[in-house]
Amino acid sequence: MPLTDLGIDEARTYRPNVPEPDGFDSFWAETLDEYSGVPQDLTAVPFDNRQALIDTWDLSWAGYHNSRVSGWLHAPAAVNGPLPLVIEYLGYSSSRGVPIGSVFAAAGYAHIVVDPRGQGWGHPTLTENCPDVHDGSGAPGFMTQSLSDPHGHYYRRLFTDAFRCLQAAREMELVDPTRIAVLGHSQGGGQAIAVCALAAMRGIKLAGAFVDVPFLCHIRRSCDIATDGPYDWKSFVTWLPTRHCAAVLSRLSGISTACISPVGPELLPGFQSR
């Protein structure tokens, strides 16, 4: 039986102590070093979205292990830029969906919607979903893949894809690299936090981060209160011998955005369309 969540007053002051695992910073530094100097190999193919005021491109770039990652790029029609950019990361089970209804492009921004690898069953799309060739086994879902080797964990792959999207976007003629913000809800919020931190580790300044109910921030507590997916590690630890639970949670903390977030972006003024 899960615990009841906190009351509103407790929630406002809740500041969990999430221990950072040994080697956390070096793990992510090594992840970035692995792709240092590797071209993003960005392609942008015009896509007919049947809209008069917004142009759309089918994006693709080299993500984790140079596997292709996809997304939509939307921008005001017939505008050359450079434009401020919003990169949107999506929630668990999402796909980049259909290329219509970008409120950011309608407001004068460039807007990238990133397809999360291996997901997409929760939303319709006009294109094939970005595949994921995973490196290890685990319980159903993504949280427990390759627990024996964090280098093969799904969220290491996903965060790498997300950060390389930022790197690729900064090189686009359409985009003003000094005015890029990241946006995400739930799993997308976790990605946005991770990208902020990884950007800071590489000296990249972001204009802002818009994060809503981010996923992966306090994994131990989610095991206490969750009743359903995407918290698939809950079913995993249910049958796991008790003596192994602490080790599993310690390894999962290697992808905790609560640990990575304190080194997030130096926010800059001036994120406005023009």
Spans of features found by a protein language model:
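Gly/Ser-rich "nucleophile elbow"/oxyanion-hole loop immediately N-terminal to the catalytic nucleophile
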Residues: 141-185
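Cap/lid segment of the alpha/beta-hydrolase catalytic domain
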Residues: 102-103, 107-160
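Hydrolase active-site cap/lid region
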Residues: 191-241
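N-terminal targeting or regulatory segments adjacent to alpha/beta-hydrolase or S9 domains
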Residues: 1-55
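The feature captures the conserved acid-bearing segment of alpha/beta-hydrolase catalytic domains
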Residues: 220-274
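Gly/Ala-rich beta-loop-alpha elbow adjacent to hydrolase catalytic centers
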Residues: 184-192
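Short beta-strand element of the alpha/beta-hydrolase
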Residues: 71-75, 81-92, 111
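A short loop-to-beta-strand scaffold at the N-terminal edge of the catalytic core in hydrolase folds
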Residues: 55-77
